[in-house]
Amino acid sequence: LPYFDKTNRFASIVSPQYEMPKNNSEAGWRSGRVRQQLSNKETPIDMRMKALLALQNMPARHSAGILRDTLSDGSDDLRLLAYGMLDSREKQLTHRIQDALQRYEKLPTAEERYVPTRELAELYWELVYQNLVQGDMRQFSLEQVQRYANEALKYKAKDAGLWAISGRMWTLRGDYIRAMGGFTTAIKQGFPLVR
């Protein structure tokens, strides 16, 4: 008969305490309901404005499309608010990109440049991932992801996260063979399969 190891390999933990969510006035707004409220021209403008403001609490990836749709709305107030929200999110990332570029340019060696180079690849990816750029700017951002990811991977080839970003970038650019290579390498370097 086979030998069974009877040692306990699992640790016991205390169950977490459940806390009721705080009563948030925007908690009931979901992207589907917001889109419905904004697209219904018969909804009073104050309700449509509340729906638009509820998007501030949603991730940019989910709300950018709704905000872009609102840019063609008949109400000037809604259009201006949607534009301001999109512009604010894009400016936050652009400011972080400028900071990382300044740090990148000040450092003389590839070893020292690794951290800002990786950060630049991630930040340009965020512009694309959050749907904050379109058209030529999206294409430019994907090129910058490729440039900085490749540069960072030359110094630290075992960076699983960068390989995954590279795979996603190649997928969006339509090069599925390179994308598969990026994902395969990311998994080999320890990137979790569930992400």
Predicted features along the sequence, with ranges:
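Amphipathic alpha-helical scaffolding segments comprising HEAT/armadillo-like alpha-solenoid repeats
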Residues: 28-38, 60-71, 94-102, 163-164, ...
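Start-of-helix register in tetratricopeptide repeats
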Residues: 46, 115, 161, 178, ...
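Structural detector for internal amphipathic alpha-helices that build alpha-solenoid repeat scaffolds
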Residues: 14-26, 47-58, 69, 80-91, ...
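Amphipathic alpha-helical repeat scaffolds of TPR domains
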Residues: 76, 80-83, 87, 91, ...
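N-terminal alpha-helical membrane-insertion module
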Residues: 1-21
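Short coil turns that delineate tetratricopeptide repeat
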Residues: 42, 111, 154-158, 188-191
